[in-house]
Amino acid sequence: MSNIIKALEDEQLKQDLPKFAPGDTVVVQVKVKEGDRERLQAFEGVVIAIRNRGLHSAFTVRKISNGEGVERTFQTHSPVVNSIEVKRRGAVRRAKLYYLRERSGKSARIKEKLAKK
């Protein structure tokens, strides 16, 4: 029975996702339905958490909008998520960056990861 479930889940996994990690700045294109029409809405921010659970994987993106912190959790393989683009790589030493919630201004900045030679 579990082989059937695994086969169905593998079928629904997205294959075209870029590799991203906590600390990276990403732009998530989200499909938004307004009445009878559908459009794409960009949500740009820092990835503060990733949850790897196969088809049920999720990630949380945080941004500052009008001086207010906004966090949004996306299901990685959801049809609502159209695309994910990595803008810059962040150099962090934690898997969960929840400490950024208490920080503001310059202390909330993340160093950029330098490319390996």
UniProtKB/Swiss-Prot annotation:
GO cellular component: a single term: cytosolic large ribosomal subunit
PANTHER family for this protein: LARGE RIBOSOMAL SUBUNIT PROTEIN BL19M, RIBOSOMAL PROTEIN L19
GO molecular function, one term: structural constituent of ribosome
Protein name per UniProt: Large ribosomal subunit protein bL19
Biological function: This protein is located at the 30S-50S ribosomal subunit interface and may play a role in the structure and function of the aminoacyl-tRNA binding site.
Keyword flag Ribosomal protein: yes
Family statement: Belongs to the bacterial ribosomal protein bL19 family.
Keyword terms, alphabetized: Ribonucleoprotein, Ribosomal protein
Ribonucleoprotein as UniProt keyword: yes
Biological process, per Gene Ontology: translation
Gene: rplS
A Pfam family recorded for this sequence: Ribosomal_L19
Membrane-spanning residues: none
